[in-house]
Amino acid sequence: MNSFPFQTAQTEEEIHHPSIIFKLQNALYSINSKHVESILSVPDYEKIPNAPNNIIGVFAFRTGMIQILDLRAMLGKVSLQSELTDFQQMIAARRQDHINWVNELERTTQSGETFTLTNNPHKCALGKWYDQFTSDNKGVMFYLKKMEEPHRLLHASIDEIERSKEIADPKARARKQAFILRCARTEYMPKVIQSLEKALDSFQTSVNQAIILVLKDESGEHHIGLMVDEVLAVESFLPSTVQHAFQSIQKSPYIRGIGKCEKVAGDILEIDAASVISSVIHAPAEED
């Protein structure tokens, strides 16, 4: 008896085929290699006007033109492209925030006005975002980590400016403030911006490393491309015998079970290849 209401037993033929273990937005999935014709880097493809959000486009395969499906969209996840766009917009906004911050620090120092923006690196928009941001993209996290110290020093510049106001000699005070502003403008801010841009480059690289799994139906006549984030391993999938409460996942017609494998740690959700393929092959034709 299956432990999961949605779990379907593997066929005898599937048992003798390893599974493709892949990643999709920080979660692990598998699909039996019996249903996989080929594994490709994302090829050049044509977008389809007014296509559903789960159809990325079509590309030439040896059997003709086949559709590329966005498995993220099919499972109710944010698409890779949307995730990249959001990240690009966030980086651009936080970059401009800190350019504006330095501009305002220079202006208020020169005018003698009170600086009203935050001196706390954890309370600016970038700091608030970074403190709660997590990613399994090591490149992104590496460059964001490198941003911490120059970001701290940048915000500490306002405290240094305030202390410099205690210098009695006007010329000495002006020299000190010019030095502080120069460090903020030419050292700390560029390092923050460079780290953000390199984090974005790493994110872009990971998107470019997406993989297409070319699936085939039982007859071998119909094919579709399934876009996934990254292929991790090809090995045996071991269906779980322990009850798990994945209520939202149970509602997906594209998930057939849950299990593990030896080389990749963590729970792995098994994709029902037949359901994915039939969603395209047997999809109702749109009315004119």
PLM region spans:
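The feature marks the first
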Residues: 2-53
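Short flexible coil/turn linkers enriched for glycine and charged/polar residues
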Residues: 14, 25, 52, 206-207, ...
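Flexible, small-/acidic-enriched active-site or ligand-binding loops
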Residues: 35-59, 228-264
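DNA polymerase processivity clamps
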Residues: 55, 71-86, 201-220
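N-terminal assembly/transducer modules of large multi-domain enzymes
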Residues: 55-65, 156-157, 224, 262-270
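Extended intrinsically disordered, low-complexity coil regions enriched in Ser, Thr, Gly, Ala
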Residues: 77-82, 118-119, 208, 224-250, ...
